[in-house]
From Swiss-Prot:
Residues 1-38 are annotated as: Disordered. It comes from Saccharomyces cerevisiae (strain ATCC 204508 / S288c) (Baker's yeast). This is Histone H2B.1. Monoubiquitinated by the RAD6/UBC2-BRE1 complex to form H2BK123ub1. H2BK123ub1 gives a specific tag for epigenetic transcriptional activation and is also prerequisite for H3K4me and H3K79me formation. H2BK123ub1 also modulates the formation of double-strand breaks during meiosis and is a prerequisite for DNA-damage checkpoint activation. Deubiquitination is performed by UBP8 in presence of SGF11. Phosphorylated by STE20 to form H2BS10ph during progression through meiotic prophase. May be correlated with chromosome condensation. H2BS10ph is also formed after H(2)O(2) treatment, and is a step leading to apoptosis. Belongs to the histone H2B family. Keywords: Acetylation, Chromosome, DNA-binding, Isopeptide bond, Methylation, Nucleosome core, Nucleus, Phosphoprotein, Ubl conjugation. The modification N6-methyllysine is found at K23. GO terms for molecular function: DNA binding; protein heterodimerization activity; structural constituent of chromatin. There is a cross-link at K7, K8, K17, K18 (Glycyl lysine isopeptide (Lys-Gly) (interchain with G-Cter in SUMO)). There is a cross-link at K124 (Glycyl lysine isopeptide (Lys-Gly) (interchain with G-Cter in ubiquitin)). Changing S11A: Desensitizes cells to H(2)O(2) treatment. The modification N6-acetyllysine is found at K7, K8, K12, K17, K18, K22, K23.
Amino acid sequence: MSAKAEKKPASKAPAEKKPAAKKTSTSTDGKKRSKARKETYSSYIYKVLKQTHPDTGISQKSMSILNSFVNDIFERIATEASKLAAYNKKSTISAREIQTAVRLILPGELAKHAVSEGTRAVTKYSSSTQA
């Protein structure tokens, strides 16, 4: 036999299995465990999409990308606001720290619009809780 006939095609090693999230299964006492909930911004992203483009849909992949984007921006703003509070020797993150963090993280015109929308949202929330 030749050397080529003896060789087997290279096979891929099986991927390691990762522990899965809680699945619905019966435990020792017969009760079903519910699946672990994963919090996303999907419903909010969808509502905004329908406000701006009522006849447009969105794929799961696109929704996943937007969800990752929102989580990333949220984390950046929270981290920056935390640093600002620490610099000023405060243990509480206020609207002022969030606003400053947004100005530092987002570029130019985008920061201005974000600050104005944020201020408007806080004002609307404050007036609704007082009434």
